[in-house]
Amino acid sequence: MVKKTIFSMAIAVAAILTSVYTLTGCQSHQGDENQLENDIDSFAIYYFNWQFPKTLKYCTQSSEPWLRYAASNVHQADVDLLRTKAEDATIEINDIDFSDDGANATVSITVHNFLQMDTIGQEAHLVEEADFHLPMSIENGVWKIRMVNLPRSERRNHD
Protein backbone atom coordinates (compact mmCIF):
# COMPACT_ATOMS: atom_id res chain seq x y z
CA MET A 1 0.00 0.00 0.00
CA VAL A 2 2.82 2.40 0.87
CA LYS A 3 4.63 1.48 -2.36
CA LYS A 4 1.46 2.21 -4.33
CA THR A 5 1.10 5.65 -2.68
CA ILE A 6 4.76 6.54 -3.29
CA PHE A 7 4.46 5.40 -6.91
CA SER A 8 1.28 7.50 -7.35
CA MET A 9 3.03 10.53 -5.84
CA ALA A 10 6.01 10.05 -8.16
CA ILE A 11 3.69 9.92 -11.18
CA ALA A 12 1.89 13.07 -9.99
CA VAL A 13 5.17 14.95 -9.47
CA ALA A 14 6.42 13.88 -12.91
CA ALA A 15 3.15 15.03 -14.50
CA ILE A 16 3.34 18.41 -12.76
CA LEU A 17 6.98 18.93 -13.76
CA THR A 18 6.19 17.97 -17.35
CA SER A 19 3.28 20.43 -17.40
CA VAL A 20 5.38 23.25 -15.96
CA TYR A 21 8.18 22.56 -18.46
CA THR A 22 5.70 22.49 -21.34
CA LEU A 23 4.00 25.71 -20.25
CA THR A 24 7.23 27.63 -19.75
CA GLY A 25 8.88 26.19 -22.83
CA CYS A 26 12.59 25.66 -23.05
CA GLN A 27 13.40 29.35 -23.40
CA SER A 28 16.94 29.89 -22.19
CA HIS A 29 17.03 33.62 -22.88
CA GLN A 30 15.46 36.76 -21.50
CA GLY A 31 12.77 38.82 -23.15
CA ASP A 32 10.12 38.00 -25.70
CA GLU A 33 11.36 36.40 -28.92
CA ASN A 34 8.34 37.66 -30.89
CA GLN A 35 9.11 41.21 -29.77
CA LEU A 36 12.73 40.71 -30.82
CA GLU A 37 11.71 39.50 -34.30
CA ASN A 38 9.14 42.27 -34.79
CA ASP A 39 11.56 44.96 -33.69
CA ILE A 40 14.48 43.72 -35.78
CA ASP A 41 12.13 43.66 -38.77
CA SER A 42 10.93 47.22 -38.11
CA PHE A 43 14.43 48.51 -37.42
CA ALA A 44 15.87 46.94 -40.58
CA ILE A 45 13.02 48.16 -42.81
CA TYR A 46 13.46 51.72 -41.53
CA TYR A 47 17.27 51.62 -41.49
CA PHE A 48 17.75 50.16 -44.96
CA ASN A 49 15.16 52.57 -46.39
CA TRP A 50 17.12 55.41 -44.74
CA GLN A 51 14.38 56.47 -42.34
CA PHE A 52 16.89 56.87 -39.51
CA PRO A 53 14.74 58.83 -37.01
CA LYS A 54 12.19 55.98 -36.99
CA THR A 55 14.91 53.47 -36.00
CA LEU A 56 15.67 55.15 -32.67
CA LYS A 57 12.90 53.43 -30.71
CA TYR A 58 14.33 50.01 -31.63
CA CYS A 59 17.90 50.80 -30.51
CA THR A 60 19.80 51.10 -27.26
CA GLN A 61 20.54 54.63 -26.11
CA SER A 62 24.21 54.10 -26.93
CA SER A 63 23.26 53.50 -30.59
CA GLU A 64 21.95 57.02 -31.17
CA PRO A 65 25.33 58.56 -32.14
CA TRP A 66 25.71 55.95 -34.90
CA LEU A 67 22.27 56.77 -36.30
CA ARG A 68 23.05 60.49 -36.19
CA TYR A 69 26.31 59.80 -38.00
CA ALA A 70 24.51 57.82 -40.72
CA ALA A 71 21.91 60.57 -41.14
CA SER A 72 24.59 63.26 -41.34
CA ASN A 73 26.16 61.50 -44.32
CA VAL A 74 23.04 61.57 -46.49
CA HIS A 75 23.42 63.96 -49.42
CA GLN A 76 20.98 65.25 -52.02
CA ALA A 77 22.23 62.76 -54.61
CA ASP A 78 21.38 59.94 -52.16
CA VAL A 79 17.90 61.36 -51.59
CA ASP A 80 17.37 61.55 -55.35
CA LEU A 81 18.41 57.90 -55.72
CA LEU A 82 16.03 56.88 -52.94
CA ARG A 83 13.16 58.68 -54.64
CA THR A 84 13.79 56.98 -57.98
CA LYS A 85 13.97 53.46 -56.55
CA ALA A 86 11.03 51.36 -57.74
CA GLU A 87 10.79 49.27 -54.55
CA ASP A 88 11.65 49.68 -50.89
CA ALA A 89 14.25 47.50 -49.22
CA THR A 90 12.96 44.25 -47.74
CA ILE A 91 14.47 41.90 -45.17
CA GLU A 92 14.44 38.27 -44.12
CA ILE A 93 15.42 37.08 -40.65
CA ASN A 94 17.69 34.07 -41.13
CA ASP A 95 18.80 33.17 -37.62
CA ILE A 96 18.85 34.38 -34.03
CA ASP A 97 21.84 33.32 -31.95
CA PHE A 98 21.35 33.92 -28.23
CA SER A 99 24.41 34.31 -26.02
CA ASP A 100 24.96 32.00 -23.07
CA ASP A 101 23.84 34.71 -20.65
CA GLY A 102 20.52 35.03 -22.51
CA ALA A 103 20.68 38.84 -22.39
CA ASN A 104 22.40 39.31 -25.76
CA ALA A 105 21.75 37.99 -29.24
CA THR A 106 23.03 38.31 -32.78
CA VAL A 107 20.43 38.36 -35.52
CA SER A 108 21.40 37.30 -39.03
CA ILE A 109 19.34 39.00 -41.75
CA THR A 110 19.34 39.24 -45.53
CA VAL A 111 18.44 42.62 -47.00
CA HIS A 112 17.15 42.96 -50.56
CA ASN A 113 17.05 45.99 -52.86
CA PHE A 114 18.70 48.65 -50.71
CA LEU A 115 20.99 51.61 -51.20
CA GLN A 116 24.38 51.03 -49.58
CA MET A 117 26.17 54.09 -48.27
CA ASP A 118 29.57 54.35 -49.82
CA THR A 119 32.63 56.15 -48.53
CA ILE A 120 32.18 59.74 -47.45
CA GLY A 121 31.66 62.00 -50.45
CA GLN A 122 30.58 59.17 -52.77
CA GLU A 123 27.03 58.45 -53.92
CA ALA A 124 25.24 55.42 -52.53
CA HIS A 125 24.82 52.41 -54.80
CA LEU A 126 22.03 49.87 -55.20
CA VAL A 127 22.66 46.41 -53.73
CA GLU A 128 20.35 43.57 -54.70
CA GLU A 129 21.09 41.36 -51.69
CA ALA A 130 23.45 41.30 -48.71
CA ASP A 131 23.72 39.62 -45.33
CA PHE A 132 24.11 41.45 -42.03
CA HIS A 133 24.60 40.43 -38.40
CA LEU A 134 22.95 42.81 -35.95
CA PRO A 135 23.77 42.67 -32.22
CA MET A 136 20.89 42.98 -29.76
CA SER A 137 20.68 43.24 -26.00
CA ILE A 138 18.05 43.55 -23.30
CA GLU A 139 17.49 47.14 -22.18
CA ASN A 140 14.81 47.75 -19.53
CA GLY A 141 13.38 44.28 -20.18
CA VAL A 142 13.02 44.83 -23.95
CA TRP A 143 15.22 43.62 -26.82
CA LYS A 144 17.03 46.51 -28.57
CA ILE A 145 19.52 46.73 -31.42
CA ARG A 146 22.94 47.57 -29.97
CA MET A 147 24.95 49.43 -32.59
CA VAL A 148 28.71 49.49 -32.04
CA ASN A 149 29.23 50.68 -35.62
CA LEU A 150 27.12 51.07 -38.74
CA PRO A 151 25.78 47.75 -40.06
CA ARG A 152 28.23 46.24 -42.54
CA SER A 153 27.39 43.51 -44.98
CA GLU A 154 29.00 40.13 -44.49
CA ARG A 155 30.76 38.37 -47.31
CA ARG A 156 28.79 35.51 -48.80
CA ASN A 157 30.41 32.13 -49.18
CA HIS A 158 29.81 31.08 -52.80
CA ASP A 159 31.15 27.50 -52.67
Residue ranges and their predicted role:
Residues 8, 32-33, 82-85, 120-124:
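Intrinsically disordered, low-complexity segments enriched in polar/charged residues with Gly/Pro
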Residues 1-24:
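Sec-dependent bacterial lipoprotein signal peptides
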Residues 49-50, 143:
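Tryptophan-centered motif/residue detector
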Residues 98-159:
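Exposed beta-sheet edge and beta->alpha loop/turn motif
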Residues 37, 52-106, 110-114:
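Short solvent-exposed beta->alpha transition segments
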Residues 21-49, 57:
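Short, low-complexity N-terminal intrinsically disordered segments enriched in polar/charged residues
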